[in-house]
Amino acid sequence: MSSSTLEGQETASHHSKNSPSRHGDDGGLQTAGDEYVYIADHYGMVRRMIFIMTVCSSMFTNQLGLCNSLSTLEEIGESFGVTDPGKLSWTISGYGLTLGTFILIGGRLGDEFGNKAIFVIGMGWLALTSMMAGVSVYAGYPVYILARVLQGLGPALTVPNALAIMGKCFSEHPRNMGFAWFAASAPVGAMAGLLFGPLFTMAWWPWIYWSQALGVAFVFALSIVAIPNMPAESEQKQRRTILEILERIDLLGGACGVTALVLFNFAWNQSLVATWKEPYVYVCLILSFLFLAAFFYVELRVARHPILPVAVLTSDIAFVFGCTAAGWSTFGIWLFYVIRICLNIGGQTPIQMAAWLSPILVTGIGTALIVGKIITKVPASSIMLFAMLCYFITSLLMALRPVHSIYWTYFFFATIIATFAMDSSLPAATIIFANAVPRQYQGMGSSVIMTIVVYSISLGLGFAGTIELQINNGGHTKADLLHGYRGTLWFSVGLTAFGTVLALIFLLKDLRRRKLARTQVEEEKGHSSEA
């Protein structure tokens, strides 16, 4: 196998029909009669680096798209004549809405039609919608928000399939480090968005998205040749009827789930614009619960290939869902409202905010790589508690921070600690999920957790925005604005306190389970020695 060329149509060889699960959890098993060859294990250094960079670009572009508008909301809104904070927040929450809602479906489409194909389609879609977001300057704010919402579909297709590609192409040890680099690309993408967003705005804000479109178009072309076909893809292309395809991708369950998530999120975020006095807002909320009930019924009673294994969800998964949602929703609140405080009250500039947040670049990469090394040696429940404590400390520091305090006190330490929280909670949650479900469902762990992560960020902003509007007295003065911002940060403190308690309970439960397991092993050894 040549390691010096990038032949996209190169396919891994294998001796059976048993390929790894979606994220490679079972891919490391080899027997004499059933051997799976990991194609990327045989790559040379240059080819391997290009492959990893291409796959990790999905997380990079995901975070880039989320953060490139964070500190430029006011400038973008001003060009459209929009100053309402509720309408401006749709720039972020709209992107997160579609991303969080469609990740599971993106993973299922990759299972059915090929991970590489869906990855490439996702990159192409992201490039086109990024161009649309820039061109919307000539069309109006609704078109801009529509473009942002459609942008979220791109990472929803690329992120889960990037994880699948990594899992199928690498054996266990290089796979773990590949996942670590995947996580490390998140702070790099976030930092790029925070830095280049304001820089391009100094020229003209549409260049934020036009430059993104050009970069993603390059990755689109590179992914065609840099990513090999998965060995199972030829098998997935066998002829199936339309009904069989729809059944395998769980179209009915997916439609009910997506509708429920979209309506629930829309109700909370649109309430910032129209308030709860508008009938259509709370009608959407009621309908979301009805569709959610329909989703659970379909997954439990109807679907032969459920998109989410509702029947096997346990208390362990409930704990990890609660911790993940609490932590990452506060991350969205913290990032959005701390930037608003600094820009609108503290007088800092967007470029200055990029400099203040720059430590996430170093600590993010370092934490991700360290966690990649220790994740198999330290109980995931302990790592989750550590992450939730970091979330809590970060939220508390930012809620207590005086507006005009120097950078090296509250802000610097909160930024460092927040990075520890993010890069340790995600792998811990994925492992806990994988350990809590039957083996055939372990491969979807990353997709499920990413769904919780991204959807929580978007929904958390909706909750926080409701609190802000209720207590800021209209936001006519800086004091009123600050009061509303502070309220959202204290809300994040409460969320992280709740998540920390959940993580502590789960840790105690896990320690008790481990103790019982050790006792049982010792008793079995004693019985066997007596025999």
From Swiss-Prot:
Residues 1-27 are annotated as: Disordered. It is a multi-pass membrane protein. Efflux pump that might be required for efficient secretion of terrein or other secondary metabolies produced by the terrein genne cluster. Belongs to the major facilitator superfamily. One of its GO terms (molecular function) is transmembrane transporter activity. GO terms for cellular component: plasma membrane. The gene is terG. Keywords: Cell membrane, Membrane, Transmembrane, Transmembrane helix, Transport. It is found in: Cell membrane. The chain crosses the membrane at residues 86-106, 117-137, 145-165, 179-199, 207-227, 249-269, 280-300, 319-339, 351-371, 380-400, 402-422, 447-467, 488-508. Induction: Expression is under the control of the terrein cluster-specific transcription factor terR. Residues 1-11 have a biased composition (Polar residues). This is Efflux pump terG.
